[in-house]
Amino acid sequence: MILRRITEHVKAQNWTAIWIQFVLLVSGVFLGIQVANWKDERWLACSRRILDHLDAREPYSEDLDICFGTCFWSSKVQFSTTAYEQLKNRGLDLISNKALLTEISRIHEYMFELVATENEQWDWQLLGSSVYPRHVERFRKYFPDSWMPLEDEYAKPVDYHALLGDTTVKNILAEIISLKGFSIATKKATALEIDALLSGIDREVSELRGR
């Protein structure tokens, strides 16, 4: 519905309406990034906790099971670029505010691509090639009686003593920590740029309404 309205407003060059509809779509991406980072920060904390626990050779604790079950998880942001493609097809040069045009293009063609390829693609490649096979070998997933759908999963080590000396698992955890930290930082930078863009659009709409 929103995309159809954008198309109609672009044809009519009704820029106030275009910007308002565009804000609705970009705001959805902004919120998606915030939620994804909230999840990733929790899972990053789990990975760090497990690695510190294993490096210190501390005894097994059932409190770690939720971390064993979720440490390798990774969130994925759904980026909507259809509104941007609509503007491109109709001619981005129709946008008179060149500062906004530059920022819109940068966010859609660079920042979104960076998050999707450099971050999420690496996460999924590592998950399929190394993390999941090792996790299935070293851990057994379970769900407590109190578990509810959409809550974090749990897992117990098959042999905790062997896990203490498993360098591969520790190296995988270190890699997860590194990649997830980079992913979180990139998504935060993207969110800041989106926030600045939304402020710029708000100013543009105010000026258009004042004419």
Regions inferred by a protein language model and the residue ranges of each:
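Long, hydrophobic alpha-helical segments that serve as membrane-spanning/inserting helices
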Residues: M1-T16, F30, N37-R211
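Hydrophobic membrane-insertion alpha-helices, especially the h-region
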Residues: W19-I33
